[in-house]
Amino acid sequence: MWKNREAQLCLFSVLLAFLPSASLLFGNSKYMVLVPSQLYTETPEKICLHLYHLNETVTVTASLISQRGTRKLFDEPVVDKDLFHCVSFIPRLPSSEEEESLDINIEGAKHKFSKRHVVLVKNKESVVFVQTDKPMYKPGQSVKFRVVSMDKNLYPLKELVQDPKMNRIMQWQDVKTENGLKQLSFSLSAEPIQGPYKIVVLKQSGVKEEHSFTVMEFVLPRFGVDVKVPNAISVYDEIISVTACDRYTYGKPVLGRVKVRLCHGNPSFSSETKSACKEENSQLDNNGCSTQEVNITEFQLKENYLKVRQAFHVNATVTEEGTGMEFGGYGRIEVERTRNKFLFLKADSHFRHGIPFFVKVRLVDIKGDPIPNEQVFIKAQEAGYTNATTTDQHGLAKFSIDTSSISGYSLNIKVYHKEENLCIHSSCTAERHAEAHHTAYAVYSLSKSYIYLDTEAGVLPCNQIHTVQAHFILKGQVLGVLPQIVFHYLVMAQGSILQTGNHTHQVESGAPVQGNFALEIPVEFSMVPMAKMLIYTILPDGEVIADSVKFQVEKCLRNKVHLSFSPSQSLPASQTHMRVTASPQSLCGLRAVDQSVLLLRPEAELSPSLIYDLPGMQDSNFIPRSHHPFEDEDDCLMYQPRDTEELTYSVPYGREKDVYRYVDMGLTAFTNLKIKHPTYCYDLPKEPPRKDPPRKDPEPKDTVVETIRNYFPETWVWDLVTVSSSGVTEVEMTVPDTITEWKAGALCLSNDTGLGLSSVATLQAFQPFFVELTMPYSVIRGEAFTLKATVMNYLPTSLQMTVQLEASPDFTAVPVGNDQDSYCLGANGRHTSSWLVTPKSLGNVNFSVSVEAQQSPEPCGSEVATVPETGRKDTVIKVLIVEPEGIKKEHTFSSLLCASDAELSETLSLLLPPRVVKDSARAHFSVMGDILSSAIKNTQNLIQMPYGCGEQNMVLFAPNIYVLKYLNETQQLTENIKSKALGYLRAGYQRELNYKHKDGSYSAFGDHNGQGQGNTWLTAFVLKSFAQARAFIFIDESHITDAFTWLSKQQKDSGCFRSSGSLFNNAMKGGVDDEITLSAYITMALLESSLPPVVSKALGCLEASWETIEQGRNGSFVYTKALMAYAFTLAGNQEKRNEILKSLDKEAIKEDNSIHWERPQKPMKSEHYLYTPQASSVEVEMSAYVVLARLTAHPAPSPEDLALSTGTIKWLTKQQNSHGGFSSTQDTVVALDALSKYGAATFSKSQKTPSVTVQSSGSFSQKFQVDKSNRLLLQQVSLPDIPGNYTIRVSGEGCVYAQTTLRYNLPLEKQQPAFALKVKTVPLTCNNPKGQNSFQISLEISYTGSRPASNMVIADVKMLSGFIPLKPTVKKLERLEHVSRTEVTTNNVLLYLDQVTNQTLSFSFIIQQDIPVKNLQPAIVKVYDYYETDEVAFAEYSSPCSSDKQNV
């Protein structure tokens, strides 16, 4: 390596300076003390003392002085006349980084010297990094990561995760690693903010380390495109060779076509408007490759070169044969002016008079390959030097320039090939040849003495000896009296002195002191990644002659880690062994990732280079803030004294180099030696002295036999293992079912040898042949589809194959065409077998297809059929959903049954309407011992409705709070339930942040790029829920503060709150004053959040409004009253609470031993019911608020409150659906809060064990026992007789919650719904051939119900069997005014409409055929009010090309 000795003074220079106050009484005695300018605690450091020509015994003392006291490092007498000695010490641990003073005292009988200088003492930083199990994640996946620390004595760390909006979504406090490693994980929500995320590790020092990963929706690619192009071409080239190769992740070539697009333009512009492009198309060959020779003469590279820097951008897109799947690759080509160029391998930044100046260059072509046997010329005008030589086989040319005759301070060198380029203007068309320039500056020495360290280029390998040549020339009048000259050297790395030594040169009388010698330097691990060497000698007159050099050291690790698989190629689902070799007792983190993930998002491979580039691994030399590099008053020669009263200081000028300026070693030095050359100065006005600002803490840096395949992970291995004392550990594991290549790696930490990293190990999961099934996601009973099984043979020989679809009573299957179950499959061939399948059963139907290679006496073509030794049979199982025709209906019958000594019974009749779809009826009976059992089991599935907006998401969040509180209070919380509930809370927290605005508010669909408006009601709901969730999960306090601040700004002088944003549930708009109802809700939320500052004014608003509310007749304001009752209960205003409850009691509906409340003008039901319909959302919500008002009484609810609440709880339980929720979101949240409080208030730990029997009028009977051990268990049985009569009996003592669920389908029939719904397809008929493969669905929707407008409306469009929606055409609907959100699933399209009036709204999108299906049945479109689910309309549509075409 050649030395880059920069001429300018940098902050990392050695500080060799006098302090003005230093006393020097030694005469000819010389001294130098060297110490690192930055010291690290808990790290051995050295201080080196050099005394020269002492004439008496002295005592040398070195001390570190800080605010904590004085610590002596060195205190010894020195008798020797000359001494060079280094002392080791370990700096103590300061509380924080601090500057300390290094005090040097040298004292003898006649002489005394003292000097003090500032050094920095700081804690040794642990080097920390983060590794994730893969670089990108899908929504809902678990993010696994490990924190790795190089410091075995690691202090507590804090990790947090930030999403793209910098929201803190997860946090771990005081994490302690085990042997330097800690693995953590967290789950992403189903709908997280997509984009880049950061894991931030905050170390004790305040320094942050960050690791990024990406969250996005993606489908793993099955193949990747590799584009091979030259790195560069010259302007004289006319052809570019572009090769595109494509292989599956399991290594086999892809068949298909490739399109290459080559664009020429300025690389700084991304837009193609700045580029000219060419396209070439070709077929991939049998190796999956295509090479194209592209003519580029039309781009006129020579003419354009000097106008703009040029480059070519190459994009290759491969289209897979058969599937049409596309994937791309990219390449870039730089355009250079010459066909070749020079690389300087050796050329110092400074020259020394009398010592040869060595130059080494390499001539390379445009690809970077060396060019041998070419003539190279050199010119050095100041030295009067010209020469020529021929490059060797490595393209190298070497020169040695005599510097003796140089009279100036610079040396300009020009190296060129063939001939000099004399024409450099843009108009020149002559070919330019390679040339390179270098300038070196003189090193200053008063005596013209110099030393130069010469070392070869390259990276030094660890654990070897490196030889450095030292060239010197020494002059001076006193040299003749010296018998010998001693050269001293130091080697530093990582800011510490590692090695010292010396070399003695004998001086011959009368001979010039000139020559060279070799120094052998052991290359140690502690020198990685860079070492610095300083050599110096002291002349008798005190002049220091020195040089320094840097060594690049191989980035090696002591802990040698090796990872391998045995065998390295395995069948899916077979056993393999992962073998790890490392230092004994190493803790190793293992990882293996599907190559498909890395194709989609390549990541930097964990390597020694990456580790040594981490913060904390770099040298950071230190210059004290108060120290000016030119402190001495006599440092420069003045041109002329100035007669002025102004203070002046001197500014050095010149580019000569001296010891002071070129020793880039990170040392602080104390010396009375001559180390600087005089510099010429001029004077400038000097500013008055300024005090340094107070010292601040450092700012934190922000700176991868038969097989049945069904297991397809993206990350296969993510484990920690400890290596045994032998240094080898083997882990047996099962290969996943994915046919791919797995990329694996290991990182290990050892207390003895530190960090080690393995190179990438690969395992090919492959079998010689396999089968893939093609089938639709779901069909409707009566439809038929073609099941295709494609078998691929990648063996070099032919196989006799049998393919079999396992028979089942759930479907019939007929082979298509002349397909046979046995056939011959040639080498590298594929074959598809097909069956026409008609499902007969409803529900999930399994299809199992097996292919097997068999022995056969018959030849396959001209070959004998072979049988592979392994992987002879492959079986794939896929599930098809078979649905009944018509519209799904569900009825739930729930009861809270409490028995004492006498048996309690209840009868139930399951009736079916006359036009029920055949075989679609099914029913089950459930028994639970706890009132919340069903909700606990189904907390993420409480209602069968979409969750796509900010308010609906909260039904996935808030109930978990009530469940955890309830189970905690009743001491029923298990680790399993707790883990799930906390996971749901964290996921809901992440999702809700999607709907936050920059001002701290929340709305149903977020800020829409700053266009949306915050919603007052939803913000209060989120604030309350986040505040309550703090007891269970991490909630960033800023989210609560931001919401509270925004709500405070919405409060009026009256104490009421103004409404902001849309209220999608217009029951909130139903009172005499919307603000009263809203204010009651917000007041309640603030009281539940323990945020009182604005509550007193809000309560005043409610009290002032009560008289108006109370005078309302016929229950006009019952919803508002229920909210106010709970708000005053929370505020502790018992008088007002009781007054409101008394008013509510007059308006209660009391029947069948139950109590509830209704609105006076609730919407009419839209259809005739066999059964009493489930109550609407508002009725459930207001009744639940009354229960909360009664049960939150202080200090405890009275017996009367409990008794009245029991009646309402009985009514509420009858409104529950089969999943434990209610009809919509807000009623589910409030009612579950009420049920949990009632359950806690009435919970009994008694050993009562009631039994429940359900019995039909026939022979069916099932008995359930409920006790303490299964209280939370949901026990269930299917009911066989539908229609039928059943009796439910409860005996023993205690309460049970019984629920019967009946489901069936009805054909679509004419009705009078609350919505007018029309559905049509375009084209209408099959005349257009495109209608068979894709067509447009158009919807027309208007509201015909009893209100002026609906609440939020959901339009649910089910897909025809075998069809999928064209996602971009659906997403485009979000641009329309009334469409707030769209969702696309495998089988449905959902449109969220903010509201619908009597004005018709129109929407359309395109669906396309994915898999052909025969006898297509119509698909259903359902439109319904989200909060009044009885307001619903249905329609159906058919494919234009289906038989019995019908659009309703």
Curated annotation (Swiss-Prot):
GO molecular function: endopeptidase inhibitor activity; protease binding; serine-type endopeptidase inhibitor activity
Cross-link (Isoglutamyl cysteine thioester (Cys-Gln)): 949-952
Subcellular compartments: Secreted
Record GO cellular component, one term: extracellular space
Residues covered by region (Bait region): 678-709
Cystines in this chain: 48-86, 245-277, 263-289, 462-556, 588-748, 636-681, 824-860, 898-1295, 1056-1101, 1326-1441
Record keywords, A-Z: Bait region, Disulfide bond, Glycoprotein, Protease inhibitor, Secreted, Serine protease inhibitor, Signal, Thioester bond
Source taxon at top rank: Eukaryota
Annotated signal sequence range: 1-24
Glycosylation sites: 55, 295, 315, 387, 502, 751, 846, 968, 1114, 1285, 1398
Family stated for the protein in its record: Belongs to the protease inhibitor I39 (alpha-2-macroglobulin) family.
Physiological role: A proteinase activates the inhibitor by specific proteolysis in the bait region, which, by an unknown mechanism leads to reaction at the cysteinyl-glutamyl internal thiol ester site and to a conformational change, whereby the proteinase is trapped and/or covalently bound to the inhibitor.
Quaternary organization: Monomer.
Identification of the protein by name: Murinoglobulin-2
Organism per entry: Rattus norvegicus
Encoding gene per record: Mug2
